[in-house]
UniProtKB/Swiss-Prot annotation:
It is found in: Mitochondrion outer membrane; Peroxisome; Cytoplasmic vesicle, Secretory vesicle, Synaptic vesicle. It comes from Rattus norvegicus. Residues 167-198 form a coiled coil. Homodimer. Interacts with DNM1L. Interacts with C11orf65/MFI; the interaction inhibits MFF interaction with DNM1L. One of its GO terms (biological process) is positive regulation of cardiac muscle cell apoptotic process. Plays a role in mitochondrial and peroxisomal fission. Promotes the recruitment and association of the fission mediator dynamin-related protein 1 (DNM1L) to the mitochondrial surface. May be involved in regulation of synaptic vesicle membrane dynamics by recruitment of DNM1L to clathrin-containing vesicles. The modification Phosphoserine is found at residues 129, 131, 146, 171. Pfam families: Miff. Keywords: Coiled coil, Cytoplasmic vesicle, Membrane, Mitochondrion, Mitochondrion outer membrane, Peroxisome, Phosphoprotein, Synapse, Transmembrane, Transmembrane helix. The modification Phosphothreonine is found at residue 89. GO terms for cellular component: mitochondrial membrane; mitochondrial outer membrane; mitochondrion; peroxisome; protein-containing complex; synaptic vesicle. This is Mitochondrial fission factor.
Length: 218
């Protein structure tokens, strides 16, 4: 309900605006610090200007005279001639001139004794670092092998203990099954014994009752 009333209000509002609001054809311009109401009362007509969109806007200083009909920068731009630029189309195929691959070595300066010594020292350092890395890698391999052996031994011990636990669990299960069977047999024997005792007790009681009745009859 509230939504319908809001839509109706908006329609009435837009309709009222479209019917009542009008764009003026002229705007009256009054001098600064002038009283418009007094001017209307005195009957002094205010200046009116027809609204038109200017073709361009020129910005000048405070006391400069607008003597030119167009901006100076546009005149400068249009007065300076542009030099034509010649552009060449790039080739479709790029070719490399035949030249030996070792031309860079040929262009290098001849080695000096100092550079030879520096190269020899660098080569020795590289060989030493390579040997140290090889020793470290071998040590790491030996350590990894020992750790792998210890871990495999632990795994074997754990596997054996797990196997023993599985065997123990199976044997315990068998013993429990046997004990259950024995208990069931004992319970059945006790039930049969109780039945026999009840029968024997009832027979003896009947026998004593019959004897006592016969004795009283005599």
């Amino acid at each position: 309900m509230a939504e319908i009333s809001r839509i109706q209000y908006e329609m009435e509002y837009t309709e009222g605006i479209s019917q009542r609001m009008r764009v003026p054809e002229k705007l009256k311009v009054a001098p600064p610090n002038a009283d418009l109401e007094q001017g209307f009362q005195d009957g002094v007509p205010n200046a009116s200007v027809i609204m038109q969109v200017p073709e361009r806007i020129v910005v000048t200083g405070n006391n400069e005279d607008i003597s030119f009909s167009r901006p100076a920068d546009l005149d400068l731009i249009q007065s300076t001639p542009f030099k034509p630029l010649a552009l060449k189309t790039p080739p479709r195929v790029l070719t490399l001139s035949e030249r030996p691959l070792d031309f860079l070595d040929l262009e290098r300066p001849p080695p000096t004794p100092q550079s030879e010594e520096i190269r020899a020292v660098g080569r020795l350092k590289r060989e030493r670092s390579m040997s140290e890395n090889a020793v470290r890698q071998n040590g790491q391999l030996v350590r990894n092998d020992s750790m792998y052996g210890i871990s495999s031994l632990d795994a074997a011990v754990e596997g054996a203990s797990e196997d023993m636990s599985v065997v123990d669990a199976a044997s315990l299960r068998r013993q429990i099954i046997k004990l259950n069977r024995r208990l069931q047999l004992l319970e059945e024997e006790n039930k049969e014994r109780a039945k026999r005792e009840m029968v024997m007790y009832s027979i003896t009681v009947a026998f004593w009752l019959l004897n006592s009745w016969l004795w009283f009859r005599r």
